[in-house]
Every structure is written in C-alpha cells, then in structure tokens.
A protein has these predicted regions:
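Short, Lys/Arg-enriched N-terminal segments with co-localized hydrophobic residues
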Residues: 3-17
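Acidic, proline/glycine-rich low-complexity IDRs
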Residues: 4-5, 113-120, 124-195
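N-terminal ordered "arm"
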Residues: 18-59
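N-terminal low-complexity, intrinsically disordered segments
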Residues: 47-83
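Short secondary-structure capping micro-motifs at structural edges
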Residues: 76-82, 89-92, 103-110
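Short coil/turn motifs at helix boundaries and re-entrant loops, enriched in small/polar
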Residues: 84-91, 171-176
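Short active-site loop/helix that positions an aromatic residue
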Residues: 89-99, 181-185
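Short, well-structured beta-strand/strand-turn elements
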Residues: 98-109, 188-194
Length: 195
C-alpha cells in the first residue's frame, strides 16, 4: 500500500533541481507483496546492512495479490522484510547502467507452484538524506529510530540514481534520472514523489 503522506524534496545534483521518489509495484493492491522464505537473517543483513556475503539465493513467496499473469505487469515487487526486488528483464537491461549505485543478486519469486527469476537490488551508496533536526524519532529498548515519514534535507548530492540514508539503511530515495530510465525503457514501476 502507498503511504497517505509524503514530502517533496528538491535534490541539487550538479546544478539540477530534482525530485526524489519512493518506488512501488505497478500491481496496485494491498496483497501485492512477497515474503522472504528464509528466516536466518543473513540475506537481509547482506542486502540492507552490508554485513556478510550473499551465499544462498533468496526465495520469496508471493501473496495473493500476485498471480502468474499479473506478475508480468510489474518490474518491481514490494517485499517483507523491506528489500528491492526487480524483474529479470529490468536487471538484464539496466544492471550495467546502474552498476555504480546498485548491485544485483539472483532471487526466486514463487507464485503458487511456479517460479520466476528476479534479482535483489543492493543500494551501494549512502548519503545524508534525512534532516535529523526536523524529523521525529521513537525509541525501542533505548535505541533511537527515525519515525516515518522522515523530513528530507533540501540539498542532497553525491549520487545519480538512488541512495540510502547514512543513518538509516532502510530509507531509500530514487531520483528523476532513475525514473526517466525506467520510463524510457518501458519498465513497469510506480513512483511516489516524496513531496
């Protein structure tokens, strides 16, 4: 599901003012997501936190919002836990262009008794994205976490397509250049401006 609130942020990249976005599946229903089958945490630690190595191929189980027919209507699948899961076609076509900012690792998506080849995307670059003074926080067991939605900084730089926040590995943004790449290659990914 898409969040009801978002914020617009202009990104200053080499003199250009750009929007930042979150990405979503083009299959828009509340049950369109996939759960990671493995429970050991090593895949999550590697993809999201850059810890360890990618030794076992991730397997995702699609929930009832995806079918063997409508899975071809999207090139990005939301996952639980939160990771980037892209279609095989997207990855083969754009991996070289995105190689400085995204690494891709093979994964499987199971829909009932069918398997589809997908790829996990691992964001390589971290940048100061969140305005730590204006954002709200919550605590769990004495550890402080950024409350969502965060307030983003007005001038963000240091990347072309996507980055994760330097303080929170699960806050990601995608720039206009990424959106233009998706649109010009006719990929099916939805964009929500963080405005």
């Amino acid at each position: 599901m898409r969040p009801s609130e978002s914020r617009r942020v202009d990104v200053n990249l080499k003199g250009w003012m750009m929007n930042i976005y979150q990405i979503y599946s083009a299959v828009d229903n509340k049950d369109a997501y996939a759960d990671l089958k493995q429970a050991d945490g090593k895949i999550i630690d590697f993809i999201n936190y850059n810890e360890g190595r990618y030794t076992n191929e991730a397997i995702f189980i699609a929930q009832r919002g995806y079918t063997s027919t409508n899975i071809h209507q999207t090139d990005y699948v939301q996952t639980i836990p939160k990771m980037l899961l892209f279609s095989e076609n997207f990855t083969y076509k754009l991996a070289e262009t995105l190689k400085n900012e995204l690494d891709f690792f093979p994964a499987k998506l199971k829909i009932k008794d069918e398997e589809f080849k997908f790829f996990l995307g691992k964001i390589k670059l971290a940048a100061n994205l969140v305005d730590m003074e204006k954002s709200s926080f919550y605590e769990i067991d004495g550890e402080k976490f950024i409350d969502h939605p965060p307030v983003f900084l007005k001038n963000i730089s240091g990347f072309e397509f996507c980055a994760k926040d330097i303080n929170d590995n699960l806050i990601w943004v995608f720039l206009d250049k990424f959106k233009e790449l998706v649109i010009s290659n006719h990929f099916k990914i939805e964009f929500l401006p963080l405005a």
